[in-house]
């Protein structure tokens, strides 16, 4: 009887020991296999943000002190949201990628964009947006995470809030090489109430407050690019006027000098800048060049 109890006790102890070792082995494997983004980049596009407008905000003035930047970069013509973002991601003019209005009609010859170039090197991309055509900027693949917040039932201001929150939550738990955050509230305010109106500045400050929240959650190894697709005047955009074609670009990171201005810059330079930071070869057919300023 005693021997039987001892055997049962010994067996129970052995099972417990085996379970403990199994747990440690599983945890160890998870740690070993955890993906690591070596040089992560966050690109933020605040749709319709004029450089003279952000210059009039407290956060805009702060960015000028901690970033390499320009308030005089050029976007592409036509200065419309989807064509401009397609050029931002593919570093070619709309005449080459084929998207010349806010509908997705790409050229059959259109090459890789940021996400596709990264995916070929098994690098990860995540995009967060609240204007549905933005989904066309990347081709679906296993290395891309996409999150759309629909503004229709909740309004644009709340859609901005939820889009930024989704970005923060995802990056807390996932390693990503390239993250794109698109905020559409400002452009909608411009169309509804006019560029540089009181409502426009309200939307701008709300958007910048969200940018500040997102940036505050990131580790120091991130490089952060804050920009836009186009400007605007009156109640619209799309022309080749200075108010529509001039955009700001801010770059914050260890390899970018604080308070220094880029000599010249274009929306076409954003994609090659991102690949250069991450360490992936830039496609030869891209038209832009990496933005780089150091002390």
Question: For each predicted feature, which ranges?
Answer:
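Metal-dependent active-site segment of extracytoplasmic phospho-/sulfohydrolases and closely related
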Residues: 42-45, 59-62, 203-242, 249, ...
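Bacterial N-terminal signal peptides
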Residues: 13-23
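Catalytic-site neighborhoods of secreted/periplasmic enzymes
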Residues: 95-158
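Polar, surface-exposed loop/tail segments
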Residues: 280-295
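Active-site His/acidic residue clusters
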Residues: 138-141, 168-213
